[in-house]
Amino acid sequence: MMVIRPVERSDVSELMQLASKTGGGLTSLPANEATLSVRIERAIKTWQGELPKSEQGYVFVLEDSETGTVAGICAIEVAVGLNDPWYNYRVGTLVHASKELNVYNALPTLFLSNDHTGSSELCTLFLDPEWRKEGNGYLLSKSRFMFMAAFRDKFNDKVVAEMRGVIDEHGYSPFWQSLGKRFFSMDFSRADFLCGTGQKAFIAELMPKHPIYTHFLSQEAQDVIGQVHPQTAPARAVLEKEGFRYRNYIDIFDGGPTLECDIDRVRAIRKSRLVEVAEGQPAQGDFPACLVANENYHHFRVVLVRTDPATERLILTAAQLDALKCHAGDRVRLVRLCAEEKTA
């Protein structure tokens, strides 16, 4: 059975294996054991209440409960940009016009922005390609909404998610090649590694401070502004079905889109509800896949089950209860997947 749980120190070796499969561009999951260990430790201290809000971040893993294999990772940053500036570009417009010459040009322009400072961030979503089946991607991505719904006071009113931009299998980023490399004088992979290992001072020191006309970029770079890596397209679709939208903010490195949504308007958060759980044999029928989560902050668990999403009393097997760290009579959080999201 596939289960979402909080990250543990012993997960570092399996997370290293996951990091080696990302293909680059996933800044928050570098193939660097020391950095991953620090990230795990920060998550543990967040759960223990030892960190200020500006440093808090939760990390979860998707585990096969039968084998202990870690198949995926996802995370939430509580409030971005309160320690180090959180940069992106806002894609806006500058108008150059002359009535005398009868000239009017509206030019797409990139403006350096810190507009999302303080927002909660969905990040570090990666599922091992071998496990991209049977609804695992939905479970991994949406489990975070179940945690946010249960512990709403831990998070801010706006949630953002940076989507990985267009990068090829060799680490070539058209957006970086045309813009970032001119200011940072390094390859994309180097900048990505430095950022992923926490060495972010160079961003503020070297990045352009003035608006940039996108027409000055290569056509290839212009074409990928706000576009996602092919492997990230499903993750974008999942978030958009939950209510997230692209509001013309992009990543400063690869030009990938930043999606955003008010936390209380996220579908899974808004529609999830608490029901009593009982042990037994679930009724047979053509029921939709639903997320089920416990309400245990320190031992949070989420699984995917097929059940009636309108039920007031959820029947689970002993194995499902054990996976959720629940007992009969406990209350669990329940919400169905979107109707078009299939798990088989």
Curated annotation (Swiss-Prot):
Enzyme class: transferase
An example molecular function term from Gene Ontology annotations: arginine N-succinyltransferase activity
Gene3D superfamilies assigned to the protein according to its UniProt record, in alphabetical order: 2.40.40.20
Record carries keyword Nucleotidyltransferase: no
EC numbers for this chain: 2.3.1.109
Pathway(s) served: Amino-acid degradation; L-arginine degradation via AST pathway; L-glutamate and succinate from L-arginine: step 1/5
Single Gene Ontology BP annotation: arginine catabolic process to glutamate
Keywords: Acyltransferase, Arginine metabolism, Transferase
Catalysed reaction equations from the record: succinyl-CoA + L-arginine = N(2)-succinyl-L-arginine + CoA + H(+)
SUPFAM superfamilies reported for this sequence: Acyl-CoA N-acyltransferases (Nat) (SSF55729)
Presence of keyword S-adenosyl-L-methionine: no
Catalytic center residues: H229
Domain of life per record: Bacteria
Family membership noted in the UniProt record: Belongs to the arginine N-succinyltransferase family.
Protein's job: Catalyzes the transfer of succinyl-CoA to arginine to produce N(2)-succinylarginine.
The protein's name: Arginine N-succinyltransferase
Annotated source species: Escherichia coli O6:K15:H31 (strain 536 / UPEC)
Gene name tied to this protein: astA
